[in-house]
Amino acid sequence: MPSEPSRLLTVHGYSLSGNCHKVRLLLEQLALAYRWIEVDSSAGETRTPAYLAKNANGKVPMLELDDGRILVESDAILYWLADGTRFLPADPWWRAQAMRWLFFEQYSHEPCIAVARFVRGWTPADSSRRAELPRLLEGGHRALAVMEHHLQAARWFTGADY
């Protein structure tokens, strides 16, 4: 988190969301005080006028600062929180590598693995969405293979330490 005076951080998130989980995990790793407001996106709570007034995209997570500033998109939140900490490298090359893996997660991993998790866990057995599973699983396996390939040569995704 950029060097700012200590402030109250409020996360509007859904506990079952992987994108919310990673924000919560970094907050815990950084030992930052925060308030969690559970927003059940599956029940439409991100589509209310009050929520949409703060986040027109109607998604979680949403980080709200005590001065009213709002930051959305999980990886933008992670970047802002990690800036200036050991969780985001200062060296430009390694910082770019961290961004590479954040982008990879959102564009190659999450669209297959998280969506497959949703289809399997939250849609009825007779849902037409079940037909997507073979394609999602294939894409998920490809994403995991890329990660596995990287980790065969490196202990961590970015840099020499955790």
Predicted features and spans:
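GST-like domain detector, emphasizing the conserved glutathione-binding G-site
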Residues: 1-16, 21-134
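Surface-exposed helix-capping loop/turn segments at secondary-structure junctions
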Residues: 149-160
